[in-house]
Each structure stands twice: as structure tokens, then as C-alpha cells.
């Protein structure tokens, strides 16, 4: 072991192959048997509460400071992965992945994934990704989600088309789509300007402390002070967009029998915190194809009548 700093690795008697650099780093690590812990902590109080967790890397002041028995985690940045009991989580950025009991989460960017608690297999990239106001909304217990950026992202660019998995061998319960021309005729295409509610929320990060002056990890979910500003149009964008209202499409979905409890509908979706609706525009393609086919059938029938 290598220890440099006040109380660094001060209670470990049997663990080995750990490195602690800084005040109170890995100060409570204590293995009762001969164990290769392979923990690395660099920065003020980084990993200070790790007891039996192994293969962890914490770099930054208070990085992983309330992590106990989690393993194979990586945290880089002040307060990153601060209170963690999960495994294989990666957090890079100030306050990223603050309190996590889930596993296999990845967060890159300041406060990315900050509100994820028990969720697993999530990916949050960019400032405030998967946090209140972001396109993915605040994710807490949800799993298998990807969030890119916050509410200020205005465009996304990639050199080639996305390839979406669609192998028939991975699908079952095939039925012919019954949404076609009638559904398309009922849609209401619109132009609009964005005036996002999230822009009227003043997100001021505050850190709460317990009676002893330590960071209150149990109250982390309230460490964001949200001050709502009047929604008066001052943040309205000056450029036009085109599309549909998600609520209108959901109404059509329900009428067609595609509303399944509170789960994601065929075309509409709801963020994990239930605060923002979205549309999966790529799924309109099969419906448009069906509508064209139905229309072509009608055209051919009329043509046949005219020619005979």
C-alpha cells in the first residue's frame, strides 16, 4: 500500500495494493483478511468511507467520499460518485452520479446523472444530462436510459445515418399494422417556436450538511434549489420548427387502442419524472408507408373503374 496524507489508509490492517493520496483518503478501509483491494483515492477525503469495496478509483476532492462497499467504480471530479453502494459505475465531472445504489451507470459531464439513485445501465453525457429540465428528464430509479445534454441543445449532427436493430430473429408476435391513412388524416402538422419550461427554472446547486458539518448524502435529492420564474415568453426561440403536439398524437393513440397503462405508447413517450412528453418520429415511417399503400389501392381501384 501507498499512503500520503493525514489519516490516509489509517485503519487498514490486511488490505493490500491500495493507493491513498490526500487528507482522509481511504481512511476507513479495513479488510479483515489478506485481500488485494486495488483501491486508488487521490484528493481531499476521496473514498474516505470505503470499508470493503475493491477495485475502485476516486480522483478529486470528496470523490466517492461516502462510498462503502461498492466495487469496480471510477469517479473523477469533485463530489463525483459521492455516495455510492453500486458496482461498475463510472462518473467523470463535478457532482456527476451523486448518489447511486444501482450498477453499470456512466455519467460524463458536470452534474450528469446527478439524480440517478437506484437505476442501472444508464448513460448520461453532457452538462445536467438525465437531470430535471433535460430532454430525458430527471431519472431516479429508471434503468437502461441514455441522455445527451441539457435543455439548451439546439441541434445534433452525425456524419452517417443511425442503424437501428431490426432483425426478424429477435422479434415475435407479428401482426399487420392497422394504423394507416385514417390515422395520418387525423394528424395535425404544425409549425411552432420552442418556449421550454426548463428555461424558466433557476437551477442553483446547494449542498446540505448534517449536524456534524458533513455533507448530507441522504438529502442529496434536495440539493438542487429550483426557483421557478414566470413563464412569460422571454426565453422563446426565434426560429421555427415543424412537427406535431405529443398530446394530440397520444389522443389518437388512445382512440386506436394503443394506450397500455402508463407504459410508453406506440409513438409518444414520457420522461422518467413524468414531466415531459416526446415523440418517436422514426416510428411514423411504417404508418406513412401503410397510408401510401392504402391510398394507392384506392387510386388503382378508381383507375380501373374509369378505364372500364
Cite the ranges covered by each PLM segment.
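Glycine- and small/polar-enriched repetitive beta-structure motifs of secreted/surface proteins
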Residues: 1-167
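Intramolecular chaperone/auto-protease modules of tailspike-like proteins
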Residues: 166-308
Amino acid at each position: 500500500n501507498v499512503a500520503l496524507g493525514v489519516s490516509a489508509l489509517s485503519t487498514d490492517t490486511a488490505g493490500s495494493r491500495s493507493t491513498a493520496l490526500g487528507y482522509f483518503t481511504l481512511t476507513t478501509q479495513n479488510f479483515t483478511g489478506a485481500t488485494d483491494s486495488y483501491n486508488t483515492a487521490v484528493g481531499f477525503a476521496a473514498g474516505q468511507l470505503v470499508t470493503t469495496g475493491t477495485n475502485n478509483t476516486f480522483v478529486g476532492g470528496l470523490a466517492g467520499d461516502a462510498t462503502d462497499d461498492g466495487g469496480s467504480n471510477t469517479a473523477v471530479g469533485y463530489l463525483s460518485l459521492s455516495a455510492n453502494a453500486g458496482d461498475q459505475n463510472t462518473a467523470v465531472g463535478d457532482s456527476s452520479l451523486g448518489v447511486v445504489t444501482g450498477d453499470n451507470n456512466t455519467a460524463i459531464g458536470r452534474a450528469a446523472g446527478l439524480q440517478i439513485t437506484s437505476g442501472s445501465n444508464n448513460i448520461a453525457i453532457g452538462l445536467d444530462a438525465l437531470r430535471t429540465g433535460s430532454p430525458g428528464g430527471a431519472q431516479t430509479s429508471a434503468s437502461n436510459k441514455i441522455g445527451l445534454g441539457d435543455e439548451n441543445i439546439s441541434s445534433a449532427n452525425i456524419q452517417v445515418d443511425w442503424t437501428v436493430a431490426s432483425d426478424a430473429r429477435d422479434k415475435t408476435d407479428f401482426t399487420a399494422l392497422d394504423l394507416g391513412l385514417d390515422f395520418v388524416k387525423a394528424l395535425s402538422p404544425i409549425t411552432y417556436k420552442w418556449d421550454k419550461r426548463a428555461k424558466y427554472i433557476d437551477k442553483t446547486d446547494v449542498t446540505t450538511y448534517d449536524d456534524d458539518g458533513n455533507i448530507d448524502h441522504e438529502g442529496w435529492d434536495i440539493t438542487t434549489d429550483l426557483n421557478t420564474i414566470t413563464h412569460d415568453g422571454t426565453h422563446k426561440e426565434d426560429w421555427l420548427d415543424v412537427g406535431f403536439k405529443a398530446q394530440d398524437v397520444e389522443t389518437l393513440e388512445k382512440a386506436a387502442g394503443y394506450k397500455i397503462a402508463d407504459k410508453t405508447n406506440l409513438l409518444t413517450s414520457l420522461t422518467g419524472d413524468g414531466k415531459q412528453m416526446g415523440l418517436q418520429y422514426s416510428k411514423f415511417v411504417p404508418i406513412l408507408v401503410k397510408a401510401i399503400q392504402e391510398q394507392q389501392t384506392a387510386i388503382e381501384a378508381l383507375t380501373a373503374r374509369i378505364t372500364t
